[in-house]
Amino acid sequence: MSHIPSELKYATSHEWIRVEANGEAVVGITEHAQELLGDMVFVDLPEVGKQVGAGDDCAVAESVKAASDIYSPVSGEILAVNEELEGSPELVNSDPYGAGWLFRIKLDDAGELANLLDAEGYQNVVDEE
């Protein structure tokens, strides 16, 4: 069974988001998602400064099995991307909730977080697959 940290929020499309005290947030894909995809070979990240809407596809994870779109769980401006993934995409596999983060985003509307799932809700989504 996949690890689902309780302090994060989740999208049904298997992204996680961690909101920080300064109103910025970090986004990545869940352990469950990386298990389904398999070994990462490349991650195409969004451009810094790009505006994205909640649910917009903004990145692509390419693994030995498939390429999968990654969606922004919230609306906002991309502030930074994890440049470590350029040379080490496998960090998404080995540490999906830590060193394998994908991008930082400045939230346009913190109210959108209410549309996301807590750990229990996300576990139910995983169980239904």
From Swiss-Prot:
- One GO CC term, this protein: glycine cleavage complex
Q: What does this protein do?
A: The glycine cleavage system catalyzes the degradation of glycine. The H protein shuttles the methylamine group of glycine from the P protein to the T protein.
List, separated by semicolons, the cofactors it needs.
(R)-lipoate
N6-lipoyllysine modifications at: K65
- Family as reported in the entry's similarity comment: Belongs to the GcvH family.
Where does the Lipoyl-binding domain start and stop, copy by copy? 24-106
Q: Which NCBIfam families match?
A: gcvH, PRK01202.1
* SUPFAM superfamilies attached to this UniProt entry: Single hybrid motif
Note the Gene3D superfamilies from the entry.
2.40.50.100
Q: Which key words tag this protein in UniProt?
A: Lipoyl
Please give the CDD domains that the UniProt record associates with this protein. Answer: GCS_H (cd06848)
The gene for this chain is: gcvH
One Pfam family, short name please?
A: GCV_H
* Quaternary organization: The glycine cleavage system is composed of four proteins: P, T, L and H.
- What's the protein here called? Glycine cleavage system H protein
Write down the species: Aeromonas hydrophila subsp. hydrophila (strain ATCC 7966 / DSM 30187 / BCRC 13018 / CCUG 14551 / JCM 1027 / KCTC 2358 / NCIMB 9240 / NCTC 8049)
One of the protein's GO biological processes: glycine decarboxylation via glycine cleavage system
What does this protein's record comment on cofactor binding? Binds 1 lipoyl cofactor covalently.
Q: In its keyword annotation, does this UniProt entry include Glycosyltransferase? A: no
